[in-house]
């Protein structure tokens, strides 16, 4: 007798990461081109010496460091094996049957529909607005008696667009208090909206028990290979997250690197500013070439190429630069270092390429 596997799993698509190819420039996975901060690299080496010991299952030291950094209590912070693991755990603690609905904009983070179906819940996708941003009014209007969870990816992956604080607060005011709203801020460190409008989810959600904020050390901090992210929210939600947390899933090296990165965060601004300079240079060059490129608050830009997306991705790969096509929606291009960006522009801004794909 063969094992009885859930039949619905056969319809779940595998998560598709950005491609890798030796010798090619990889602008497909939103990774930083720089290694971890020096203090983090040192902490990684030291922590590796203790790899024969189990890590702190509660990530107590890291939670305390984050609580101090964010101005919250330790009880408001949970740690996960990357913020995507926390996304799945949030579905687990809110949804218990296929009648339960998880709302999110589309297109948005590719993992949302996957983890929703894995969690045996129903995904409800709300189309983006014409400017490739979350349609917050439509998202609020899509809430039903079955809605349990809403993911708001801000800035949005893969389109790079972001809503300011005022728009987010209006949206949150429209959502029933029993529906959990997740502000997924994986690219928070790259946002450069005005100080008055910059949507710090921790501040926005400070007096809203139904708001949880997710951030990660994978992007700006350069720890993508170590898998460590965190959630900030009401103690009741955090307690539930820690109940479904897979024991020891945040390893010792990841915890040490994250703590060291926080302690050296003053070094991060120079790195993120360099990315932003290149982001704007890349976008301006693509606009000048004739492409439609929405403003980005992330470490990538979005080319809404529609049906040409896959073909553009293959042509770029043939030119030695890997980018990330998304079906028939568009192509996401990570901001690399100046040399890598120039290689991509030599391909994309070529008049023959523009005429073919624009």
Curated annotation (Swiss-Prot):
Would you identify the family this protein belongs to, as annotated?
A: Belongs to the class-II pyridoxal-phosphate-dependent aminotransferase family.
Instruction: Recall the GO molecular function terms of this protein's record.
Output: aromatic-amino-acid transaminase activity; histidinol-phosphate transaminase activity; pyridoxal phosphate binding
Q: Which residues carry this modification: N6-(pyridoxal phosphate)lysine?
A: 219
PANTHER family recorded for this chain? HISTIDINOL-PHOSPHATE AMINOTRANSFERASE, HISTIDINOL-PHOSPHATE AMINOTRANSFERASE 2
Q: Which cofactor does it need?
A: pyridoxal 5'-phosphate
Gene that this sequence comes from:
pat
Q: Does the keyword Transferase apply?
A: yes
Name the chain's protein: Aromatic amino acid aminotransferase
Q: Does the keyword Nucleus apply?
A: no
User: What is annotated about its quaternary structure and interactions?
Assistant: Homodimer.
Q: PROSITE patterns annotated for this entry?
A: AA_TRANSFER_CLASS_2 (PS00599)
Instruction: List the EC numbers from the record.
Output: 2.6.1.57
């Amino acid at each position: 007798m063969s094992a009885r596997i859930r039949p619905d799993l056969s319809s779940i698509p595998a998560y598709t990461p950005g491609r890798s190819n030796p010798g090619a420039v990889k602008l497909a996975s939103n990774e930083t081109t720089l290694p971890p901060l020096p203090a983090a690299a040192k902490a990684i080496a030291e922590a590796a010496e203790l790899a024969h010991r189990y890590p702190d299952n509660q990530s107590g030291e890291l939670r305390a460091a984050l609580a101090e950094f964010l101005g919250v209590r330790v009880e408001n912070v949970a740690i996960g094996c990357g913020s995507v693991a926390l996304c799945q755990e949030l579905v687990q603690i809110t949804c218990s049957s296929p009648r339960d609905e998880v709302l999110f904009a589309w297109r948005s983070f590719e993992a949302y529909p996957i983890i929703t179906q894995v969690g045996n819940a129903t995904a409800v996708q709300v189309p983006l607005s014409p400017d490739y941003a979350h349609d917050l009014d439509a998202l609020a209007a899509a809430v039903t008696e079955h809605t349990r969870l809403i993911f708001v990816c801000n800035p949005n992956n893969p389109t790079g667009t972001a809503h300011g604080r005022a728009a987010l607060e209006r949206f949150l005011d429209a959502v029933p208090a029993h529906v959990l709203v997740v502000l997924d801020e994986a690219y928070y460190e790259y946002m450069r909206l005005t100080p008055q409008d910059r949507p710090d989810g921790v501040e926005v959600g400070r007096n809203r028990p139904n708001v949880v904020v997710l951030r990660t050390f994978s992007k700006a901090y350069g720890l993508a290979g170590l898998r460590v992210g965190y959630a900030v929210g009401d103690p009741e939600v955090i307690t539930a997250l820690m109940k479904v947390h897979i024991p020891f899933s945040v390893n010792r090296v990841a915890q040490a690197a994250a703590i060291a990165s926080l302690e050296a965060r003053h070094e991060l601004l120079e790195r993120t500013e360099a990315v932003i300079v290149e982001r704007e240079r890349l976008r301006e060059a693509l606009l000048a070439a004739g492409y439609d490129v929405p403003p980005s608050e992330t470490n990538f830009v979005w080319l809404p190429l529609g049906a040409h997306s896959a073909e553009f991705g293959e042509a770029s790969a043939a030119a030695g630069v890997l980018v990330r096509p998304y079906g028939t929606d568009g192509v996401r291009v990570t901001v690399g270092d100046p040399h890598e960006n120039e290689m991509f522009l030599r391909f994309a801004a070529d008049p023959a390429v523009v005429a073919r794909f624009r």
